[in-house]
Design a protein with these regions (language model features):
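Active-site rim/loop-helix segments in enzyme catalytic domains that contact anionic ligands
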Residues: 3-19, 26-133, 162-163
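Histidine-centered divalent metal-coordination motifs
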Residues: 45, 141, 147
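Short, well-ordered, mixed-charge alpha-helical segments that flank or form enzyme active sites
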Residues: 117, 146-148
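Short Gly/Thr/Asp-enriched flexible loops that form oxyanion-binding sites at enzyme active sites
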Residues: 148-161
Length: 163
């Protein structure tokens, strides 16, 4: 099963399921009675936020959080046999649909799949995004992930969040 098929299967299963013993949060009677909190989920590629913490995103959304799904790239190199333009069009459409299913607002950044970079400009871009969104909680990749783009994303997010 490829990631695309897995995401479809998992999304269907999540729709009617509470996850990780988070029933109390998901059924929060105070949701909507206080200022909304915001969760920012930042992944390197389309599908990373959903496959990494889609269940948590859904539970937070049901608890009244504003959930924002940030994609550092548009998945340009994500589909073998497709051009970067074809692949990014498909992956952006999939991520947009997944965000809709999870009650999240998608944001697409400007890095290129497979060629992500850490430099002063990229730190500024991430810091400005986080400052503009003003999240209460941020989720991202594990810093020692096997995928280079995931490690870049984690480093940028961690350093931007600390400042």
């Amino acid at each position: 099963m490829n990631r695309r098929d897995m995401l479809k299967t998992v999304s269907a299963a999540i729709a009617g399921t509470s996850l990780l013993g988070m029933e109390a949060l998901a059924s929060n009677p105070h949701a909507g009675t206080s200022p909304a909190k915001k969760a920012l989920i930042i992944g390197a590629h389309p599908d990373d936020p959903e496959t990494g913490c889609g269940g948590t995103m859904l539970v937070l959304e049901k608890a009244g959080y504003e959930v924002v799904s940030v994609y550092m790239t548009k998945g340009e190199a994500g589909i073998p046999g497709k051009t970067h333009e074809e692949s990014s069009a498909i992956r952006v459409a999939e991520a947009t649909k997944a965000s809709e299913m999870l009650g999240a607002r998608p944001i697409f950044m400007t890095q290129i799949d497979g060629s992500t970079e850490i430099n002063k400009e990229r730190y500024v871009e991430m810091r400005e995004l986080i400052a503009a969104e003003k999240p209460d909680v941020v989720f991202t990749h594990w810093p020692i992930d096997s995928h280079a783009d995931h490690r870049v994303c984690s480093s940028l997010v961690y350093d931007a969040w600390r400042r």
